[in-house]
A protein has these predicted regions:
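Ferredoxin-type iron-sulfur electron-transfer modules in oxidoreductases and energy-metabolism complexes
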Residues: 688-700
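Catalytic or ion-translocation cores adjacent to nucleophile or general acid/base/metal-coordination motifs
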Residues: 348-349, 353-389
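Long, compositionally biased, glycine/small-hydrophobic-enriched stretches that function as flexible linkers
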Residues: 1-324, 331-337, 446-650, 725-726, ...
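Conserved thiamine diphosphate
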Residues: 324-331, 378-423
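Glycine-rich beta-alpha junction loops
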Residues: 368-370, 409, 432-437
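Cysteine-centered iron-sulfur cluster-binding motifs in ferredoxin-type domains/subunits
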Residues: 664-680, 697-715
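A short, small-residue-rich loop immediately preceding and capping a beta-strand
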Residues: 330-346, 361-364
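Polybasic, low-complexity binding patches
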Residues: 699-703, 720-739
Length: 742
């Protein structure tokens, strides 16, 4: 009897998720994917965490890994060669003790933790303790030491925001201080040359104490007042300058400017919910408009360029609609860090609207749970989408910087995080910070790394300002094997005969779900003696046609608490979720230019056309050779001539491509941003998947088609040639349409 037929309980479990009898055992606490077996004690590894959140705003390097800090210290203090080996080992031991301290929950500055770690690393060696303690003086930096915990994400992102904000503050204060000084000089000069400035007491105050008794200031006043101009500073100009000075000195956006006289507390820009940030922005907008207006007037007055006739009417009507991107870029962006347990709260329901409106805000959305147990069509999701789809949905809004990552990858993306904080306009940071405590005892770093590795939460960035196409805007960030469905790792283990076996394992979404003990009911452990030929790795099972997959049982490799290797079969429900995860990954791959369906179709058409052309050339050569006579003077010349005269198959005959003369839309790539429908909803329509197509050419103009192509965030609208030759302005429109031609 076939072993696969004998153990039908495995097939039953896969199909129903129910264990029959005692041959299959439940997945208990302590099981983890086989590829995570070597990482039970992270304190023994030198990797990116913990990190030091560097204090001070002078440096753009706002975060450093502990390993890089100690590595720099070794390079600076330890001599090269054998004589520096002892100090190198001592510093590496100290680094490990720091890592252990932080893993045990100890918090504080690096300078505070260093002495205790030095004492632990040195043990009873007082000399080593002194050396390690003195080494702290060469650190050159200090800051909070924090592990890859659930608290890391908000602190690291906030530190990046503060680093960017400090640069803005320095530039703004320099500008405001310069303008205050210039306007003050104008008023001071006007006063000195005025009647009041020529009075004896005013003249006396302008002299130092040493010579005050030497001069007769009353007589001096009579002499100088003869040359005082009759026209003092015009009243309107004086009033305008004094108003601008008062606004500049009292501005609450960047306290600490020259002559600052701001009343009340300076504005705070850090919030934990969207509603509060929106309310603050609206309340402060009039004050911001007033300050921008004052800066503009001050700059004109400082260079003597203010013209009452030209500038007066403009500034009288100056309001929030006159603000430009350059104006807003001078001020702090709002930072909204939404706690992981408040994503679905009412005060955060307007997040998407806030981002699409272009408000100067940076939003951090933290995800603490990727478990999706809701039935199809049921359940409530924060912001209306599942966690892993929030960032991809936001890409359709246009004009944003978007970063999706796990906390384990944040340090590697530190420069991208800071870049996003410095971008003009809104930005979204969507970060998975590790599974909750209820998921099991897997360290947050491993949980986050597993989510990224399994494609459950891949890392990418989207920068709308980086260029005009997906190649410049979208970037995968540190995902393994981006061209494959699943990342592949070499796995070594000992078989039942204690012989080394090397095997390549793929880390799938099912492996990630195995890390969460709340998913235990989706798995069943199979004893080695019951392994059958019907069992197949989950990654391979997903590649099978449906009629073949029903006869096979998918499994993943796992280890228990004692590192014993097991096969764990997966039920159909979780495999469906794994397939959905893979589908989303394929969509991301297309955004990144990997396995792009349009490119592959175009390549297939070109290959077919090339093959058809070669076949015709060969056929022409064969015919020419068959018709050639032995007495021909130049038999070799005929095939060449025949080849030149042979008809060549047009590429379009193999597989017709969209003509560049006809308007068309790459519907499958549509992000449902509504830009085209906002222009003309009769010309453009949505199909059942809410993706755009051309509904009726006669319902619109070529101008609307070109405008839609220019507005499309994913550049999928190709205007083709005008269908109405009498439409005005076609020459200009054709020039604008060139970048979007197929």
């Amino acid at each position: 009897m076939d072993m696969a037929a004998k153990f039908q309980d495995q097939t039953v479990f896969h199909m129903t998720g129910k264990r029959a009898g005692e041959s299959l055992t439940a997945l208990t606490t302590g099981f983890r994917p086989a590829l995570l077996a070597p990482y039970r004690d992270l304190t023994r590894l030198r990797y990116d965490y913990p990190v030091v959140l560097v204090e001070g705003d002078a440096s753009r390097e706002y975060v450093r890994s502990l390993s890089s800090v100690v590595g720099g210290l070794i390079a600076e203090l330890a001599p090269r060669g054998i004589e520096g080996e002892r100090l190198r080992k001592q510093l590496l031991r100290l680094e490990r003790e720091l890592r252990v301290l932080v893993a045990d929950g100890t918090t504080g500055l690096l300078s505070d933790l260093w002495p205790e770690a030095a004492a632990r690393a040195a043990g009873r060696d007082d000399g080593a303790r002194d050396v390690l303690t003195r080494a702290a003086g060469a650190l050159g930096i200090d800051g909070e030491v924090i592990d890859c915990s659930r608290a890391l994400t908000e602190r690291l992102v906030t530190r990046a925001w503060k680093s960017v904000n400090a640069e803005k503050a320095r530039a703004f204060r320099l500008l405001v201080d310069h303008l205050i000084r210039k306007l003050s000089d104008i008023l001071r000069a006007a006063f000195v040359h005025s009647q009041a400035g020529q009075q004896p007491q005013a003249l006396k105050s302008g002299f130092g104490d040493l010579h005050r008794d030497t001069f007769d200031f009353s007589a001096m006043s009579k002499l100088v007042t003869r040359n005082v101009p009759k026209d003092e500073l015009p009243a309107k100009r004086r009033q305008r300058i004094e108003w601008a000075l008062a606004v500049l000195r009292s501005q609450p956006f960047y306290p600490g400017s020259r002559g600052s006289g701001a009343k009340g507390e300076p504005y705070a820009f850090e919030f934990d919910n969207c509603a509060a940030a929106i309310e603050a922005h609206r309340a402060r907008l009039p004050r911001l408009v007033e300050l921008v207006k004052a800066i503009a007037i001050a700059e004109l007055e400082a260079r003597g360029g203010y013209d009452e006739a030209d500038h007066g009417p403009f500034f009288e009507r100056y309001d929030e609609h006159a603000l430009t991107a350059d104006d807003l870029a001078q001020f702090p962006d709002y930072l909204v860090c939404i706690p992981a347990d408040r994503n679905g709260a009412p005060e955060n329901a307007a997040m998407m609207e806030m981002l699409s409106a272009g408000m100067p805000v940076k939003v951090l959305v933290q995800h603490g749970d990727l478990l999706e147990e809701a039935a199809i069509g049921q359940g409530h999701f924060a912001f209306g989408v599942r966690s892993a789809r929030l960032a991809t949905t936001a890409m359709g809004l246009g004009g944003l910087f978007i970063l999706q990552s796990t906390s384990s990858n944040l340090y590697a993306l530190r420069d991208r995080v800071r870049h996003g904080m410095g971008c003009r306009g809104p930005a979204l940071f969507s970060v998975f910070s590790g599974s909750p405590d209820a998921a099991g005892n897997l360290a947050p770093y491993l949980s986050a790394a597993a989510a990224m590795k399994s494609r459950a939460f891949p890392a990418f960035t989207y920068d709308a300002n980086a260029g005009t196409n997906w190649a410049t805007r979208f970037s995968f960030e540190n995902n393994r094997n981006t061209g494959d469905d699943w990342p592949v790792e070499e796995f070594a283990y000992a078989d039942e005969n204690v012989q080394r076996v090397n095997e390549q394992l793929r880390f799938t979404y099912a492996d990630f779900m195995l890390c969460d003990q709340r998913n235990a009911h989706h798995f069943a452990v199979v004893p080695r003696e019951r392994w059958t030929t019907a069992m197949i790795p989950a990654s391979d099972w997903l590649l099978l046609p449906e009629n073949q997959a029903t006869d096979r049982v998918p499994y993943v490799m796992a280890v228990d608490g004692s590192d014993k290797l097991h096969r764990v079969i997966v039920d159909a429900r979780l495999m469906q979720a794994t397939r959905r995860c893979l589908l989303l990954w394929h969509r991301l791959q297309e955004h990144g230019g990997i396995h792009n369906s349009h490119a592959e179709q175009a390549l297939a058409r070109e290959k077919a056309a090339w093959q058809a052309q070669k076949e015709q050339e060969l056929e022409a050569l064969r015919k020419a050779a068959a018709s050639a006579t032995p007495a021909a003077a130049a038999p070799a010349a005929e095939p060449v001539a025949a080849r030149a005269e042979a008809p060549v198959a047009a590429p379009t005959e193999a597989a017709p491509a969209p003509s560049s003369d006809q308007p068309w839309i790459e519907t499958i790539r549509c992000s449902s941003c509504n830009e085209c429908q906002n222009i003309n909803d009769k010309l453009f329509g949505y199909d059942g998947n809410k993706q755009a197509f051309i509904k009726d050419l006669n319902a619109g103009t070529y101008k609307e088609m070109v405008e839609a192509a220019e507005a499309c965030q994913v550049a999928i609208i190709h205007p083709g040639k005008p269908w109405n030759p009498n439409e005005p302005g076609l020459e200009e429109l054709l020039e604008r349409a060139k970048p979007f031609m197929a």
